[in-house]
Amino acid sequence: MMKSLANAVGAKTARACDSCVKRRARWYCAADDAFLCQSCDSLVHSANPLARRHERVRLKTASPAVVKHSNHSSASPPHEVATWHHGFTRKARTPRGSGKKNNSSIFHDLVPDISIEDQTDNYELEEQLICQVPVLDPLVSEQFLNDVVEPKIEFPMIRSGLMIEEEEDNAESCLNGFFPTDMELEEFAADVETLLGRGLDTESYAMEELGLSNSEMFKIEKDEIEEEVEEIKAMSMDIFDDDRKDVDGTVPFELSFDYESSHKTSEEEVMKNVESSGECVVKVKEEEHKNVLMLRLNYDSVISTWGGQGPPWSSGEPPERDMDISGWPAFSMVENGGESTHQKQYVGGCLPSSGFGDGGREARVSRYREKRRTRLFSKKIRYEVRKLNAEKRPRMKGRFVKRASLAAAASPLGVNY
Protein backbone atom coordinates (compact mmCIF):
# COMPACT_ATOMS: atom_id res chain seq x y z
CA MET A 1 0.00 0.00 0.00
CA MET A 2 2.87 2.35 0.84
CA LYS A 3 4.40 1.68 -2.56
CA SER A 4 1.19 2.43 -4.41
CA LEU A 5 0.72 5.62 -2.37
CA ALA A 6 4.24 6.70 -3.22
CA ASN A 7 3.65 6.01 -6.88
CA ALA A 8 0.41 7.99 -6.78
CA VAL A 9 2.05 10.98 -5.19
CA GLY A 10 5.03 10.69 -7.49
CA ALA A 11 2.77 10.75 -10.51
CA LYS A 12 1.46 14.21 -9.56
CA THR A 13 4.59 15.85 -8.18
CA ALA A 14 8.32 15.57 -8.61
CA ARG A 15 9.05 13.37 -5.59
CA ALA A 16 7.21 12.09 -2.53
CA CYS A 17 8.55 12.45 1.02
CA ASP A 18 10.46 9.35 2.09
CA SER A 19 9.28 9.74 5.68
CA CYS A 20 5.54 10.43 5.58
CA VAL A 21 4.88 9.53 1.86
CA LYS A 22 2.04 12.09 1.88
CA ARG A 23 3.59 15.39 0.83
CA ARG A 24 5.96 16.60 -1.85
CA ALA A 25 9.65 16.45 -1.01
CA ARG A 26 11.15 19.91 -0.54
CA TRP A 27 14.60 19.03 0.83
CA TYR A 28 17.26 16.46 0.02
CA CYS A 29 19.66 15.41 2.79
CA ALA A 30 22.85 13.83 1.49
CA ALA A 31 23.87 12.53 4.92
CA ASP A 32 20.58 10.68 5.39
CA ASP A 33 20.12 10.06 1.63
CA ALA A 34 16.45 11.00 1.95
CA PHE A 35 13.97 13.33 0.30
CA LEU A 36 11.91 15.06 3.01
CA CYS A 37 9.02 17.45 3.09
CA GLN A 38 9.10 20.66 5.10
CA SER A 39 7.53 19.24 8.31
CA CYS A 40 9.54 16.02 8.28
CA ASP A 41 12.73 17.94 7.58
CA SER A 42 12.19 20.24 10.57
CA LEU A 43 11.27 17.27 12.75
CA VAL A 44 14.28 15.14 11.80
CA HIS A 45 16.96 17.82 11.69
CA SER A 46 15.96 19.55 14.93
CA ALA A 47 16.45 16.46 17.10
CA ASN A 48 20.06 17.14 18.11
CA PRO A 49 23.01 19.37 17.17
CA LEU A 50 24.53 16.63 14.98
CA ALA A 51 21.39 16.43 12.85
CA ARG A 52 21.34 20.22 12.55
CA ARG A 53 24.77 20.12 10.86
CA HIS A 54 23.53 17.95 7.96
CA GLU A 55 23.87 19.66 4.60
CA ARG A 56 20.51 19.81 2.83
CA VAL A 57 19.53 20.94 -0.66
CA ARG A 58 16.36 22.82 -1.52
CA LEU A 59 14.43 21.13 -4.34
CA LYS A 60 12.62 23.02 -7.10
CA THR A 61 8.86 23.12 -7.19
CA ALA A 62 8.59 23.16 -10.99
CA SER A 63 9.88 20.52 -13.39
CA PRO A 64 12.95 21.68 -15.27
CA ALA A 65 12.82 22.20 -19.00
CA VAL A 66 15.62 22.80 -21.43
CA VAL A 67 15.25 26.21 -23.05
CA LYS A 68 17.03 27.00 -26.27
CA HIS A 69 18.33 30.54 -26.63
CA SER A 70 18.82 32.15 -30.00
CA ASN A 71 21.92 34.01 -28.95
CA HIS A 72 23.69 30.85 -27.73
CA SER A 73 26.43 29.60 -29.93
CA SER A 74 26.53 26.01 -31.09
CA ALA A 75 29.96 25.61 -29.58
CA SER A 76 28.75 26.21 -26.01
CA PRO A 77 28.36 22.94 -24.08
CA PRO A 78 24.86 22.03 -22.89
CA HIS A 79 23.89 22.18 -19.20
CA GLU A 80 24.58 18.97 -17.34
CA VAL A 81 21.75 17.64 -15.20
CA ALA A 82 22.62 16.40 -11.70
CA THR A 83 22.98 12.66 -11.30
CA TRP A 84 20.43 12.48 -8.48
CA HIS A 85 17.89 14.31 -10.65
CA HIS A 86 17.53 11.49 -13.20
CA GLY A 87 14.91 8.82 -12.95
CA PHE A 88 12.12 10.59 -11.10
CA THR A 89 11.18 13.53 -13.36
CA ARG A 90 8.06 13.04 -15.42
CA LYS A 91 6.69 14.92 -18.39
CA ALA A 92 3.41 16.72 -18.10
CA ARG A 93 0.50 14.84 -19.61
CA THR A 94 -0.96 17.95 -21.23
CA PRO A 95 0.91 20.60 -23.18
CA ARG A 96 1.89 23.61 -21.07
CA GLY A 97 2.23 26.19 -23.85
CA SER A 98 5.53 25.03 -25.26
CA GLY A 99 5.03 27.30 -28.32
CA LYS A 100 5.61 30.43 -26.25
CA LYS A 101 9.18 31.15 -25.36
CA ASN A 102 9.91 33.24 -22.28
CA ASN A 103 13.51 34.33 -22.12
CA SER A 104 13.08 35.87 -18.68
CA SER A 105 12.25 32.54 -16.99
CA ILE A 106 15.36 30.39 -17.11
CA PHE A 107 15.50 27.16 -15.11
CA HIS A 108 18.88 26.02 -13.95
CA ASP A 109 19.30 22.31 -13.59
CA LEU A 110 22.23 22.58 -11.23
CA VAL A 111 21.31 22.65 -7.55
CA PRO A 112 23.07 25.57 -5.81
CA ASP A 113 25.24 24.94 -2.78
CA ILE A 114 24.07 25.95 0.64
CA SER A 115 25.34 29.39 1.59
CA ILE A 116 27.19 30.14 4.80
CA GLU A 117 24.30 32.20 6.11
CA ASP A 118 22.02 29.17 6.47
CA GLN A 119 20.00 28.54 9.59
CA THR A 120 22.33 25.74 10.64
CA ASP A 121 25.06 28.30 11.18
CA ASN A 122 22.90 30.02 13.78
CA TYR A 123 22.83 26.87 15.88
CA GLU A 124 26.59 26.47 15.55
CA LEU A 125 27.08 30.10 16.58
CA GLU A 126 24.89 29.63 19.65
CA GLU A 127 26.83 26.50 20.66
CA GLN A 128 30.11 28.36 20.26
CA LEU A 129 28.87 31.25 22.38
CA ILE A 130 27.75 28.89 25.12
CA CYS A 131 31.07 27.04 25.27
CA GLN A 132 33.29 30.07 24.54
CA VAL A 133 35.49 31.60 27.22
CA PRO A 134 34.89 35.38 27.50
CA VAL A 135 37.77 37.52 26.27
CA LEU A 136 38.50 40.83 27.95
CA ASP A 137 38.64 43.59 25.37
CA PRO A 138 40.58 46.60 26.75
CA LEU A 139 38.80 49.09 24.48
CA VAL A 140 35.35 47.95 25.54
CA SER A 141 36.33 47.90 29.21
CA GLU A 142 37.70 51.47 29.01
CA GLN A 143 34.53 52.69 27.35
CA PHE A 144 32.42 50.99 30.03
CA LEU A 145 34.50 52.53 32.82
CA ASN A 146 34.15 55.98 31.28
CA ASP A 147 30.37 55.63 31.13
CA VAL A 148 30.09 54.64 34.80
CA VAL A 149 29.96 57.56 37.23
CA GLU A 150 32.27 56.91 40.15
CA PRO A 151 31.04 58.25 43.52
CA LYS A 152 33.48 60.63 45.16
CA ILE A 153 33.59 61.85 48.75
CA GLU A 154 33.83 65.62 48.84
CA PHE A 155 34.54 67.63 51.96
CA PRO A 156 32.48 70.76 52.63
CA MET A 157 34.09 73.94 51.33
CA ILE A 158 33.13 77.60 51.34
CA ARG A 159 31.54 78.31 47.98
CA SER A 160 29.99 81.35 46.45
CA GLY A 161 26.31 81.77 45.71
CA LEU A 162 26.71 81.20 41.97
CA MET A 163 28.51 77.93 42.51
CA ILE A 164 25.83 76.76 44.93
CA GLU A 165 23.05 77.58 42.46
CA GLU A 166 24.85 75.77 39.63
CA GLU A 167 25.41 72.71 41.79
CA GLU A 168 21.77 72.68 42.84
CA ASP A 169 20.66 72.82 39.21
CA ASN A 170 23.04 70.01 38.29
CA ALA A 171 21.88 67.90 41.23
CA GLU A 172 18.26 68.40 40.29
CA SER A 173 18.95 67.41 36.71
CA CYS A 174 21.08 64.38 37.62
CA LEU A 175 19.12 63.06 40.58
CA ASN A 176 15.67 63.63 39.18
CA GLY A 177 13.41 60.83 40.35
CA PHE A 178 15.52 59.78 43.34
CA PHE A 179 14.37 62.48 45.78
CA PRO A 180 10.78 63.46 46.66
CA THR A 181 9.15 66.18 44.65
CA ASP A 182 7.99 69.56 45.95
CA MET A 183 4.39 68.38 46.14
CA GLU A 184 5.38 65.44 48.32
CA LEU A 185 7.40 67.70 50.63
CA GLU A 186 4.46 70.09 51.00
CA GLU A 187 2.11 67.22 51.84
CA PHE A 188 4.59 65.94 54.42
CA ALA A 189 4.87 69.40 56.02
CA ALA A 190 1.07 69.68 56.17
CA ASP A 191 0.84 66.29 57.87
CA VAL A 192 3.46 67.32 60.45
CA GLU A 193 1.59 70.55 61.14
CA THR A 194 -1.64 68.68 61.75
CA LEU A 195 0.17 66.29 64.10
CA LEU A 196 1.84 69.01 66.18
CA GLY A 197 -1.15 71.37 66.13
CA ARG A 198 0.87 74.44 65.22
CA GLY A 199 2.74 75.91 62.27
CA LEU A 200 6.33 75.26 61.37
CA ASP A 201 7.03 78.82 60.21
CA THR A 202 8.62 79.84 63.52
CA GLU A 203 12.38 79.97 63.57
CA SER A 204 13.01 78.35 66.96
CA TYR A 205 12.07 74.78 67.78
CA ALA A 206 12.85 74.72 71.49
CA MET A 207 11.65 72.18 74.05
CA GLU A 208 9.35 74.79 75.59
CA GLU A 209 7.39 75.20 72.35
CA LEU A 210 6.91 71.47 72.05
CA GLY A 211 5.69 71.28 75.65
CA LEU A 212 8.67 69.31 76.95
CA SER A 213 10.30 71.77 79.38
CA ASN A 214 11.56 70.77 82.80
CA SER A 215 8.90 72.73 84.68
CA GLU A 216 6.07 71.14 82.74
CA MET A 217 7.58 67.68 83.15
CA PHE A 218 7.82 68.30 86.89
CA LYS A 219 4.17 69.38 86.94
CA ILE A 220 3.13 66.20 85.12
CA GLU A 221 5.04 64.01 87.57
CA LYS A 222 3.54 65.87 90.53
CA ASP A 223 0.01 65.43 89.16
CA GLU A 224 0.61 61.72 88.65
CA ILE A 225 1.86 61.32 92.23
CA GLU A 226 -1.17 63.16 93.60
CA GLU A 227 -3.51 60.94 91.58
CA GLU A 228 -1.83 57.81 92.92
CA VAL A 229 -2.14 59.09 96.51
CA GLU A 230 -5.84 59.81 95.99
CA GLU A 231 -6.42 56.33 94.57
CA ILE A 232 -4.67 54.73 97.56
CA LYS A 233 -6.77 56.78 99.96
CA ALA A 234 -9.96 55.80 98.17
CA MET A 235 -9.01 52.12 98.28
CA SER A 236 -8.22 52.32 102.00
CA MET A 237 -11.55 54.03 102.66
CA ASP A 238 -13.37 51.29 100.77
CA ILE A 239 -11.57 48.60 102.80
CA PHE A 240 -12.47 50.26 106.10
CA ASP A 241 -16.07 50.75 104.98
CA ASP A 242 -16.34 47.06 104.12
CA ASP A 243 -14.91 46.09 107.52
CA ARG A 244 -17.29 48.40 109.42
CA LYS A 245 -20.49 47.31 107.72
CA ASP A 246 -23.31 46.49 110.07
CA VAL A 247 -25.39 43.34 109.95
CA ASP A 248 -28.21 45.21 108.20
CA GLY A 249 -25.88 46.26 105.42
CA THR A 250 -25.82 49.97 106.31
CA VAL A 251 -22.50 51.76 106.09
CA PRO A 252 -21.80 54.50 108.68
CA PHE A 253 -20.28 57.70 107.28
CA GLU A 254 -16.95 58.53 108.94
CA LEU A 255 -14.48 61.11 107.71
CA SER A 256 -10.90 60.24 108.72
CA PHE A 257 -7.71 62.05 107.71
CA ASP A 258 -5.32 59.79 109.64
CA TYR A 259 -4.20 57.62 106.76
CA GLU A 260 -1.11 56.25 108.50
CA SER A 261 -2.84 55.44 111.79
CA SER A 262 -5.75 53.79 110.03
CA HIS A 263 -3.35 51.80 107.88
CA LYS A 264 -1.48 50.63 110.99
CA THR A 265 -4.69 49.67 112.77
CA SER A 266 -5.84 47.66 109.74
CA GLU A 267 -2.51 45.82 109.63
CA GLU A 268 -2.72 45.05 113.35
CA GLU A 269 -6.24 43.70 112.91
CA VAL A 270 -5.13 41.47 110.06
CA MET A 271 -2.23 40.11 112.12
CA LYS A 272 -4.56 39.45 115.04
CA ASN A 273 -6.97 37.59 112.76
CA VAL A 274 -4.14 35.48 111.36
CA GLU A 275 -2.82 34.67 114.84
CA SER A 276 -6.27 33.77 116.10
CA SER A 277 -6.92 31.55 113.08
CA GLY A 278 -3.54 29.86 113.58
CA GLU A 279 -4.31 29.21 117.23
CA CYS A 280 -7.69 27.74 116.28
CA VAL A 281 -6.04 25.42 113.78
CA VAL A 282 -3.47 24.29 116.35
CA LYS A 283 -6.22 23.67 118.89
CA VAL A 284 -8.26 21.63 116.42
CA LYS A 285 -5.20 19.52 115.60
CA GLU A 286 -4.48 18.94 119.27
CA GLU A 287 -8.08 17.90 119.85
CA GLU A 288 -7.87 15.45 116.97
CA HIS A 289 -4.68 13.98 118.40
CA LYS A 290 -6.32 13.69 121.78
CA ASN A 291 -9.37 11.94 120.36
CA VAL A 292 -7.21 9.25 118.71
CA LEU A 293 -6.18 7.09 121.67
CA MET A 294 -4.33 3.81 121.62
CA LEU A 295 -5.83 0.86 123.51
CA ARG A 296 -3.87 -0.04 126.61
CA LEU A 297 -4.57 -3.51 127.94
CA ASN A 298 -4.14 -4.78 131.46
CA TYR A 299 -2.30 -7.96 130.69
CA ASP A 300 -2.66 -9.35 134.24
CA SER A 301 -6.44 -9.09 134.20
CA VAL A 302 -6.64 -10.58 130.70
CA ILE A 303 -4.45 -13.52 131.68
CA SER A 304 -6.49 -14.14 134.84
CA THR A 305 -9.75 -14.00 132.84
CA TRP A 306 -8.53 -16.41 130.14
CA GLY A 307 -6.83 -18.64 132.65
CA GLY A 308 -8.49 -21.99 131.89
CA GLN A 309 -10.21 -21.29 128.54
CA GLY A 310 -7.24 -22.10 126.32
CA PRO A 311 -5.62 -19.85 123.73
CA PRO A 312 -7.72 -16.82 122.62
CA TRP A 313 -7.08 -17.38 118.87
CA SER A 314 -9.54 -19.35 116.79
CA SER A 315 -6.79 -21.29 115.03
CA GLY A 316 -5.19 -22.25 118.31
CA GLU A 317 -1.82 -20.68 117.38
CA PRO A 318 -0.81 -17.02 117.57
CA PRO A 319 -0.34 -15.33 114.16
CA GLU A 320 3.03 -14.10 112.95
CA ARG A 321 3.43 -10.40 113.61
CA ASP A 322 5.55 -8.52 111.06
CA MET A 323 6.72 -4.99 111.80
CA ASP A 324 6.89 -2.43 109.01
CA ILE A 325 9.47 0.35 108.66
CA SER A 326 7.62 2.80 110.89
CA GLY A 327 7.44 0.25 113.74
CA TRP A 328 3.64 -0.21 113.80
CA PRO A 329 2.37 -3.79 114.08
CA ALA A 330 0.59 -5.44 111.20
CA PHE A 331 -2.53 -5.97 113.30
CA SER A 332 -3.67 -3.25 115.69
CA MET A 333 -6.77 -2.40 117.65
CA VAL A 334 -8.07 1.20 117.65
CA GLU A 335 -10.73 2.56 119.92
CA ASN A 336 -13.11 5.16 118.47
CA GLY A 337 -15.95 6.49 120.60
CA GLY A 338 -15.72 3.67 123.13
CA GLU A 339 -15.99 0.92 120.51
CA SER A 340 -12.96 -1.19 119.65
CA THR A 341 -12.45 -2.24 116.05
CA HIS A 342 -9.80 -4.38 114.38
CA GLN A 343 -7.72 -2.80 111.60
CA LYS A 344 -5.35 -4.68 109.37
CA GLN A 345 -2.20 -2.80 108.52
CA TYR A 346 -0.85 -4.04 105.20
CA VAL A 347 2.87 -3.57 105.12
CA GLY A 348 4.23 -1.86 102.00
CA GLY A 349 0.83 -1.82 100.34
CA CYS A 350 0.86 -5.60 99.85
CA LEU A 351 -2.11 -7.78 100.69
CA PRO A 352 -1.74 -10.55 103.25
CA SER A 353 -2.59 -13.14 100.63
CA SER A 354 0.44 -12.20 98.52
CA GLY A 355 2.71 -14.27 100.69
CA PHE A 356 5.03 -11.40 101.55
CA GLY A 357 5.17 -12.26 105.23
CA ASP A 358 6.54 -15.74 104.72
CA GLY A 359 8.73 -14.71 101.78
CA GLY A 360 6.66 -16.55 99.16
CA ARG A 361 7.06 -14.03 96.39
CA GLU A 362 10.74 -13.46 97.09
CA ALA A 363 11.33 -17.18 96.99
CA ARG A 364 9.53 -17.51 93.68
CA VAL A 365 11.45 -14.58 92.19
CA SER A 366 14.77 -15.98 93.35
CA ARG A 367 13.94 -19.41 91.94
CA TYR A 368 12.94 -17.88 88.60
CA ARG A 369 16.16 -15.87 88.39
CA GLU A 370 18.29 -18.87 89.24
CA LYS A 371 16.50 -21.00 86.68
CA ARG A 372 16.94 -18.34 84.02
CA ARG A 373 20.62 -17.95 84.82
CA THR A 374 21.28 -21.67 84.63
CA ARG A 375 19.26 -21.99 81.44
CA LEU A 376 21.30 -19.31 79.69
CA PHE A 377 24.53 -20.82 80.96
CA SER A 378 23.59 -24.30 79.76
CA LYS A 379 22.57 -22.84 76.41
CA LYS A 380 25.97 -21.19 76.00
CA ILE A 381 27.73 -24.42 76.95
CA ARG A 382 25.65 -26.40 74.45
CA TYR A 383 26.46 -24.03 71.60
CA GLU A 384 30.16 -23.97 72.48
CA VAL A 385 30.27 -27.77 72.44
CA ARG A 386 28.56 -27.87 69.06
CA LYS A 387 31.00 -25.33 67.70
CA LEU A 388 34.03 -27.31 68.86
CA ASN A 389 32.63 -30.53 67.45
CA ALA A 390 31.96 -28.87 64.10
CA GLU A 391 35.50 -27.52 63.97
CA LYS A 392 36.95 -30.96 64.70
CA ARG A 393 34.82 -32.78 62.11
CA PRO A 394 36.62 -33.56 58.84
CA ARG A 395 35.69 -31.52 55.79
CA MET A 396 36.16 -31.90 52.08
CA LYS A 397 35.58 -28.85 49.88
CA GLY A 398 33.90 -27.09 52.77
CA ARG A 399 31.41 -29.86 53.50
CA PHE A 400 31.29 -32.41 56.28
CA VAL A 401 32.49 -35.90 55.41
CA LYS A 402 31.72 -39.08 57.30
CA ARG A 403 34.66 -40.62 59.03
CA ALA A 404 34.12 -44.04 57.39
CA SER A 405 34.19 -42.61 53.87
CA LEU A 406 37.21 -40.50 54.79
CA ALA A 407 39.10 -43.56 56.04
CA ALA A 408 38.21 -45.51 52.88
CA ALA A 409 39.45 -42.69 50.68
CA ALA A 410 42.67 -42.39 52.70
CA SER A 411 43.62 -46.10 52.44
CA PRO A 412 45.56 -46.80 49.18
CA LEU A 413 44.11 -50.27 48.61
CA GLY A 414 40.60 -49.46 49.74
CA VAL A 415 41.01 -51.52 52.94
CA ASN A 416 39.39 -50.09 56.02
CA TYR A 417 41.55 -50.31 59.09
Swiss-Prot record:
A zinc finger (B box-type) spans 17-59. Residues 63-105 are annotated as: Disordered. Keywords: Coiled coil, Metal-binding, Nucleus, Zinc, Zinc-finger. Zn(2+) binds at residues 17, 20, 40, 45. The keyword Protein biosynthesis does not apply. One of its GO terms (biological process) is regulation of DNA-templated transcription. SMART domains: BBOX. Residues 212-239 form a coiled coil. One of its GO terms (molecular function) is DNA-binding transcription factor activity. Residues 361-403 form the CCT domain. GO terms for cellular component: nucleus. Belongs to the CONSTANS family. This is Zinc finger protein CONSTANS-LIKE 16.
